[in-house]
């Protein structure tokens, strides 16, 4: 499968990188192209490690089968299934529940958001909703106890029960 990881804003890099890592780690037969929006992202930290472009034309020519977007818009004329990845907890934002008709699928981060978007999917009838979790948070779960020994050492050395760093 040809996949585009679409980064219009710098924060999108950390949200999409777990997808790149998963494909690489699992040796999956997918080809990934990152789109980096140059006016908003002046440096791409993985530039020497992954295939990437600043050109929408190159994205189009790549003929993606799926485009992952942690943002609100993606050019409608690009080929492939367009997937919006929700990545925060800002349900109070006025535009959070607006359906802009750019996306075929919405990946939601939890039951609260999933239920709201499923109701919208029934109303609009032209997109799907899938609860996937929040890939940017996966690191926390995977490394939850990685620093326990360091924590205990700091507490012992400081003579404190808790520390706020």
Predicted features by range, described:
Residues 4-148, 154-155:
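Active-site and donor-binding regions of nucleotide-sugar-utilizing enzymes
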Residues 158-165:
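Conserved donor-binding/catalytic core segment of Leloir-type glycosyltransferases
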């Amino acid at each position: 499968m040809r996949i585009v990881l679409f980064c219009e804003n710098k924060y999108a890099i950390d949200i999409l990188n777990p997808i790149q890592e998963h494909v690489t780690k699992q040796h999956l037969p997918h080809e990934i192209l990152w789109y980096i929006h140059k006016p908003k992202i002046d440096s791409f930290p993985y530039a020497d490690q992954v295939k990437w472009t600043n050109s929408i034309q190159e994205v189009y020519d790549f003929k993606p089968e799926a485009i992952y977007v942690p943002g609100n818009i993606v050019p409608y004329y690009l080929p492939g299934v367009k997937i919006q990845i929700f990545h925060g907890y800002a349900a109070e934002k006025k535009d959070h529940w607006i359906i802009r008709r750019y996306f075929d699928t919405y990946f939601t981060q939890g039951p609260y958001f999933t239920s709201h978007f499923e109701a919208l999917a029934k109303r609009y009838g032209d997109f799907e909703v899938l609860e996937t979790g929040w890939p940017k948070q996966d690191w926390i779960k995977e490394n939850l106890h990685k620093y326990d020994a360091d924590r205990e050492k700091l507490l012992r050395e400081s003579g404190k029960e808790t520390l706020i760093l």
